[in-house]
């Protein structure tokens, strides 16, 4: 089966090797990055082209990076060609979450709608603060930063790719 780019979820990039036993040092791309340590089937990409499909042998954390060993590779020279590659997994292989919880990749790109104001725009990014995540929405109201708290989120509909908010007055600057 040929994998399409849309079938894959890129979770990190190989930034180097670690030690002599073929460990790869991976830097994460966003909050979904820790998922990579649990996935068994991996795809390494360079400029959108598949370099290697393989199984994870071992994974562990070291100084904020994921150290990854892949099956069949036990020497640093054998994995050196993977430095600079993106590390992806098949979207279909990602384990589900409990009801009401979502991976960031599921939310990014959703159409954001407020009950009172209507369409806000596209949920383009998410970042973390000490208190909670913040959704970055761009659209007719410019950039709107919405705290990701249950009080503001009325509904998340993955099938229709829409997130419905019930935002308080003053959070969105109306023109």
UniProtKB/Swiss-Prot annotation:
Residue ranges annotated for the PRC barrel domain, each copy included: 99-171
Keyword Membrane attributed: no
Membrane-traversing stretches: none
UniProt-annotated location(s): Cytoplasm
Annotated Gene Ontology cellular component terms: cytoplasm; ribosome
Pfam families attached to this UniProt entry: PRC_RimM, RimM
Keyword vocabulary terms for this entry: Chaperone, Cytoplasm, Ribosome biogenesis, rRNA processing
Major location category of this protein: cytoplasm
GO molecular function annotation: ribosome binding
Family: Belongs to the RimM family.
Comment block on domains: The PRC barrel domain binds ribosomal protein uS19.
Assembly behavior: Binds ribosomal protein uS19.
PANTHER family hit by this protein: RIBOSOME MATURATION FACTOR RIMM (PTHR33692:SF1)
Protein name, UniProt field: Ribosome maturation factor RimM
Species whose genome carries this gene: Syntrophotalea carbinolica (strain DSM 2380 / NBRC 103641 / GraBd1) (Pelobacter carbinolicus)
């Amino acid at each position: 089966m040929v994998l399409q780019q849309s079938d894959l979820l890129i979770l990190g990039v190989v930034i180097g090797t670690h030690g002599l036993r073929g460990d790869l040092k991976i830097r994460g791309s966003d909050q979904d990055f820790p998922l990579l340590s649990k996935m068994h089937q991996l795809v390494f990409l360079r400029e959108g082209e598949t370099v290697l499909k393989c199984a994870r042998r071992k994974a562990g954390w070291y100084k904020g990076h994921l150290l990854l060993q892949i099956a069949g590779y036990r020497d640093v020279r054998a994995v050196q060609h993977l430095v600079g590659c993106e590390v992806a997994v098949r979207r279909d292989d990602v384990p589900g979450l409990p009801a009401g919880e979502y991976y960031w990749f599921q939310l990014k790109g959703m159409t954001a709608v407020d009950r009172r104001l209507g369409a806000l725009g596209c949920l383009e990014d998410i970042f973390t603060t000490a208190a909670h995540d913040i959704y970055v929405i761009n659209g007719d109201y410019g950039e709107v930063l919405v705290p990701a708290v249950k009080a503001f989120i009325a509904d998340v509909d993955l099938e229709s790719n829409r997130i419905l908010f019930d935002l308080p007055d003053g959070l969105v600057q109306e023109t």
